[in-house]
Amino acid sequence: MSKGTPSQGKHNKGSNHIICRRCGRRSYHVRKKACSACGFGASKRLKTFAWKNKKINGQRVR
């Protein structure tokens, strides 16, 4: 096994985020056990911010 820069490229396999059960987005962090989009796993309340979604026709979109 070699170490150094060539072996650092092998760290990009796999993904930390899977599909969230609550919001359906690919934002559920497997190791943290929390969704970065809706807050599932970390909070009972839905994680929402005004800056997170752009207004279209006066309505917020997901």
Swiss-Prot record:
One Pfam family of this chain: Ribosomal_L37e
Any GO CC annotation of this UniProt entry: cytosolic large ribosomal subunit
Cofactor(s), by name: Zn(2+)
UniProt KW Nucleotide-binding keyword: no
Zinc finger (C4-type): 20-38
Sequence positions that bind Zn(2+): C20, C23, C35, C38
Cofactor binding comment, as recorded: Binds 1 zinc ion per subunit.
PROSITE patterns: RIBOSOMAL_L37E (PS01077)
GO biological process: translation
Single GO MF descriptor: rRNA binding
Keywords annotated in UniProt: Metal-binding, Ribonucleoprotein, Ribosomal protein, RNA-binding, rRNA-binding, Zinc, Zinc-finger
NCBIfam families: PRK04179.1
Protein family membership: Belongs to the eukaryotic ribosomal protein eL37 family.
Function noted in UniProt: Binds to the 23S rRNA.
HAMAP family in the cross-refs: Ribosomal_eL37
Name of this protein: Large ribosomal subunit protein eL37
Native species: Methanococcus aeolicus (strain ATCC BAA-1280 / DSM 17508 / OCM 812 / Nankai-3)
Highest classification ranks of the organism: Archaea, Methanobacteriati, Methanobacteriota, Methanomada group, Methanococci
Gene from which the chain derives: rpl37e
